[in-house]
UniProtKB/Swiss-Prot annotation:
Name of the protein described by the UniProt record: 3-isopropylmalate dehydrogenase
Taxonomy of the source species: Bacteria, Bacillati, Cyanobacteriota, Cyanophyceae, Synechococcales
Protein species of origin: Synechocystis sp. (strain ATCC 27184 / PCC 6803 / Kazusa)
Residues binding NAD(+), per UniProt: 78-91, 284-296
Gene name linked to the record: leuB
Gene Ontology terms, MF aspect: 3-isopropylmalate dehydrogenase activity; magnesium ion binding; NAD binding
Cofactor note: Binds 1 Mg(2+) or Mn(2+) ion per subunit.
Amino acid sequence: MSQTYNVTLLPGDGIGPEIMAVAVAVLGKVADQFGFAFNFQEALIGGAAIDATGQPLPEATLAQAKDSDAVLLAAIGGYAWDNLPRSQRPETGLLAIREGLGLFANLRPATIFPQLIDASSLKREVVEGVDIMVVRELTGGIYFGKPKGIFETETGEKRGVNTMAYTVGEIDRIAKVAFETARKRRGQLCSVDKANVLDVSQLWRDRVMAIAVDYPDVELSHLYVDNAAMQLVRSPRQFDTIVTGNLFGDILSDIAAMLTGSIGMLPSASLGSDGPGLFEPVHGSAPDIAGQDKANPLAQVLSAAMMLRYGLDQPQAADRLEDAVKKVLEQGYRTGDILSPGTQLVGCRQMGEQLLSILDEM
């Protein structure tokens, strides 16, 4: 009897419904090819949820997501909700669903597609063959540590305080995700910290080394964050999988992303210890082109591939989707954001049709 996966779809706002439609179509195709099935159920989040219910994350959406095998999100936000109080904006729905699902590990790949290599701001010989996965701790560190705030000292001077703190449990669980991720890739993990000056980073390094004992097949190295940032630009091919804390990961994942030259091609995943993961493209909702069939659906398709690989344990189906994306680029099809001389401009729907045609031939 074939496996059926329950997947919550969160099309969200802007171009979200358009790119989600492409992802659903290609997922259905690879499911047929590999002998499993999907039960897709849509739910509201972000601006669409605010308009319908007054809340960026309705309770019904979170409940449905918790009962799913995986959650696939498209895009959140737009100009229409920019004047709302910060706590009521669409983006708070994303933070709330991450918290509600207990997601603490953010996986951000940065892969150079040979057909798009000239979009990178770095020289071809530097970025050719780059394939990096940044595993960022998502719920701890300086963004969440306490005490925090702006206080007045005894002399009347204002003082801003944030606290970078990690527990052993928080470090151990992100380290395990990173080692498991590296094991599924090329077996190399670089832990990034600032252990030469920060006590919290010394604990980080100690715990990562302790967890490494359980992963003898993964080669572990360490870099200080300033050197890691430099090496990402100087010699990015040396990296396979990187694991780091929330603040450092926030910065390094964006550096790694821009090696590729096109944010419209970048997927991501957020995972927890158990329960469903959340899979979404890195790009925004692009309200300026929404409903015009101009959106690039490839990051959404690659997010669906990450869902297959890291959320549903269907690595062969994930490979198939990723290969289809490479093939469609090889054939010269481009949406406007990645268009270059000698390539063919297509819309979102046609890009999806080309992917389906390629999958039929694979």
